[in-house]
A protein has these predicted regions:
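Glycine-rich portal/gate segments that line the openings of hydrophobic small-molecule binding cavities
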Residues: 29, 38-85, 140-144, 148
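Hydrophobic ligand-binding cavity/cleft-lining segments
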Residues: 1-47
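Short amphipathic alpha-helical signal-transduction/dimerization elements
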Residues: 25, 130, 134, 138-149
Length: 149
């Protein structure tokens, strides 16, 4: 199992960060460049939830169908429903809070339970090297959000 936690600050407001996490338009691929456009599909959407298939071309292709829930203010939880690599119950958690002088603090948790050999290998890799990878990726996305004002 891989469990990675990281925290970053942004000049973007919490509302803008939450909006970027829950924006399933074509703009999503611009803000989150690690999403492989060939796997991205919005399955369904409700006022505070969505079913989405997304993935990455890395490691021969990793995809997951996930349930997004942003019904709790400042929080987006993404629960894996199906994946070619990880078990259902794996998740992402984003908690976004305002900073005293403007901007936001983003707390991210990534938890993966391997489904197969590929998942075991990725979990081992992410356990060792996941934090800097996710910090860099999230940092790049936050810069894109800040620049899109």
């Amino acid at each position: 199992m891989a469990h990675v936690v990281t925290d970053l600050d942004s000049t973007a407001s919490p509302e803008r960060v939450i909006h970027a996490l829950t924006d399933f338009s074509s703009r999503r691929l611009e803000l989150w460049p690690n999403i492989d456009p060939t796997t991205y599909k919005l399955e369904s959407t409700e006022p505070t939830s969505a079913e989405v298939t997304e993935g990455s071309a890395s490691f021969g292709g990793v995809w997951e169908r996930s349930h997004y829930d942003w019904s709790r203010s400042g929080t987006v939880r993404i629960d894996v429903q199906d994946s070619n690599t990880f078990e259902p119950g794996s998740y992402w958690l984003y908690e976004v809070t305002p900073l005293p002088n403007g901007g936001s603090h983003v707390h991210m948790e990534f938890d993966r339970r391997p489904r197969n050999f590929k998942g075991q290998m990725l979990s081992a890799l992410l356990t060792v090297a996941g934090k800097p990878v996710f910090q860099k990726s999230l940092g790049e996305t936050l810069k894109r959000i800040e620049a899109s004002a």
